[in-house]
């Protein structure tokens, strides 16, 4: 059951990440006042595309690897890799969320006005990409918990001497 859930989550991440990449890379809008805006103008979006590519590639390799017996026994490899990918996804998602926040609200202290009134389509597509990225991240958080369970369930719980237990009760 756990193996099927693991495999399904890894497969689910692939289309979510690919859709995130597609929405972001094809995101562009022209404005007669401010000019042409495309995803490559914003470093945070380029970072999210890069991390989404890593995420989709790793999810594919890991999904295939879950059915190869010699690799499945390497629970620590999956545990560490799932943690790293989840953390990378958090960093890229928060970078784009910061861009979205500034695009919608601006920053009066540094005289930045909001951009989404002028680039509504661009902001909408960026929001959709962040939502898809968050769904992929949710899958990886669950995968990180599953891989942690697998990695740590092979150990016995520590034995507590009976003397220590008696002192704690007193």
Swiss-Prot record:
Membrane side Extracellular: residue ranges: 26-47, 105-127
**What's in the keyword line of the UniProt record?**
Cell membrane, Membrane, Transmembrane, Transmembrane helix
- Topology feature Cytoplasmic, residues: 1-4, 69-83, 149-170
Q: Kindly list the GO CC terms recorded for this protein.
A: plasma membrane
Query: By its UniProt entry, which PANTHER family does this protein fall under?
Result: CASP-LIKE PROTEIN 2C1-RELATED, CASP-LIKE PROTEIN 4A4
What is the protein's membrane topology class?
Multi-pass membrane protein
The entry sums up its family as follows: Belongs to the Casparian strip membrane proteins (CASP) family.
Q: Where are the transmembrane segments?
A: 5-25, 48-68, 84-104, 128-148
Main location as per UniProt: membrane
Q: Where in the cell is it found?
A: Cell membrane
Say if the entry is tagged with keyword Cell membrane: yes
Q: Which domain of life is it from?
A: Eukaryota
Indicate what this protein is called per its UniProt record.
Answer: CASP-like protein 2D1
Q: Which residues form a coiled coil?
A: none
Q: How does it assemble?
A: Homodimer and heterodimers.
